[in-house]
Regions:
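Catalytic cores and adjacent flexible loops of soluble metabolic enzymes
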Residues: 1-186
């Protein structure tokens, strides 16, 4: 829902896009999926036996995605401090994975306090794309495991190559998220 997620002061900022120059709000509408696109994802994944889920960026999107009955939800790092959104995803009764990029330990603790530990997964992340190895801070996985010993702790990797992801698993990450793109211009 771009009109809810894009700050108003950014709506009319112009930018170059694969479709030419346009305002940021128009660009967001171009790249957002609607019912038809999500229905196609759902159909394809069901045919292939793939479980899929989404990161919702606002509360109406949680309600929208619920019609596809995802097995879980994922909160993007930028949403960690949006406790109302986290609660909306948690209220579905499905597991919720939260990413921690750009967050302080206090912000992580506040989010966990707001939604509770039940059906929660926490992913250590950095929010640099691509992330240099010197900024990965994989030791945070151990810190999170000590802080939340009964909670699955994972790793969300945004770096080139797979070695850091393998290292994250070796030091205890029990799930991973990887970002993949077919077109860097989008």
């Amino acid at each position: 829902t771009p009109e809810l997620c894009v700050p108003r002061d950014q709506w009319h900022l112009e930018r170059e896009t694969p479709w030419g120059r346009m305002t940021y709000i128009d660009y967001r509408y171009k790249v957002e999926f609607g019912w038809r696109e999500y229905a196609e994802i759902d159909r394809f994944c069901r045919e292939q036996g793939i479980l899929w889920f989404a990161s919702c960026w606002d509360e109406p999107s949680v309600e929208f995605i619920e019609q596809f009955d995802p097995p879980m939800y994922k909160a993007a790092s930028a949403s960690l401090t949006d406790h109302d959104l986290l609660r909306a995803m948690k209220a579905t009764g499905k597991p919720l994975a939260i990413s921690t990029g750009m967050s302080t330990m206090e912000e992580i603790e506040s989010a966990v306090l707001a939604i509770g530990l039940g059906r929660l997964l926490v992913a250590h992340a950095t929010s640099t794309y691509p992330c240099p190895a010197s900024e990965l801070n994989l030791r945070m996985i151990d810190t999170l495991k000590r802080k939340y010993p009964i909670t699955p702790i994972g790793y969300s990797g945004h770096e080139p190559g797979l070695a850091p992801t393998v290292a994250a698993i070796a030091i205890g990450a029990c799930f991973v998220e990887r970002h993949v793109t077919l077109d860097r211009s989008l």
